[in-house]
A protein has these predicted regions:
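Acyl-donor (CoA/ACP) binding surface of acyl/acetyltransferases
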Residues: 1-108
């Protein structure tokens, strides 16, 4: 299945200024115009502000999974969000669900 993951990173001195949200809205509009049926994004559970950006972009939380994250070799719980553009609100990208043994749905 073709997959389009939305990712971002910002230097600390630029945090909390709405930059990622503003840029993200433009990206979402463009990929929607380009005909993508959906995009996904993940964030570390310990970084809930990143999840807030995803929510502001209209993304919905789908599930969480535990991954041994490299290069730091630490266990991280990631939350997976998705935004469907074609009206198929039941579609959920399940690659991470199947790829990682420890997966679950949180009450957020």
């Amino acid at each position: 299945e073709e997959h389009h993951d939305f990712g971002y990173g910002l230097r600390k001195e630029f945090w909390h200024r709405g930059i990622v949200t503003e840029a993200g809205k433009a990206v979402v509009e463009q990929v929607k115009k380009d005909g993508l049926t959906y995009i996904t994004a993940t964030h570390d559970k310990e970084n809930p502000r990143s999840g807030n950006v995803m929510k502001k972009l209209g993304m919905k939380y789908c599930y969480s999974y535990e991954e041994r994250w490299q290069p730091k070799d630490i266990t991280v719980i990631f939350r997976m969000y998705q935004l469907n553009f074609d009206g198929n609100d039941d579609r959920v990208y399940k690659k991470y669900w199947y790829q990682y043994e420890n997966h679950f749905v949180e009450e957020i």
